[in-house]
Amino acid sequence: RFPEGDAPHRFDFSKNHILSSVDGILKRLNTEYLDILLLHRPDPLVEPEEVAEAFEALKASGKVKNFGVSNMSAAQIKLLSAYCSDPLIVNQLELSLKRIDWLEQGVLVNQKAGTDINFADGIIEHCRLEDIQIQAWAPLAYGMYSGREMENVTEADLQTKDLVQKMANEKGTST
């Protein structure tokens, strides 16, 4: 955790904030460039022109090689992409065996059972069409499937955890 003075307190995709954030990241990591920079969570007040200017400056300076986003909808990605000369190559989304809204959103079309799905409609398809990689965050459900003790675990969760462990053992890997 960063000291309180250095911690981000809001979503800010202004050019100045992006540029200064990258400089801080490079300094903390003691490196000259980032392979990829993700804009984390949408900034509802984004000025896409400013993001594009920041990306162009970072690319030209060699500080960032590629760009992506995290937790953005197809519409939000389209907005940024319309202004950025470099393609967005990643969208990081919460995907796991516990969080399957991404799957249900695609198969429970016109079904009452799908009314409580909390996943951006069409994001998987949009990313596939635009060659944007989906990067999973929390793929082991915050440790639920890798041995972390969790509260409010269902019987289905425990069965899934056992199955994940069994598959890992069969493959000679860890969870």
Segments from the language model and where they lie:
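Beta/alpha (TIM)-barrel catalytic core signal, keyed to glycine-rich beta->alpha loops juxtaposed to Asp/Glu
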Residues: 46-175
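Short, acidic/polar
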Residues: 11-29, 50, 75-79, 119
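N-terminal small/glycine-rich loop or linker at the start of catalytic domains
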Residues: 1-9, 33-38, 144-145
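Active-site mouth loops of central-metabolism enzymes
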Residues: 3-17, 40, 45, 112, ...
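Short, flexible active-site loop motifs that bind/organize anionic cofactors or intermediates
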Residues: 8, 24, 41, 67, ...
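Active-site groove signature of glycoside hydrolases
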Residues: 26-47
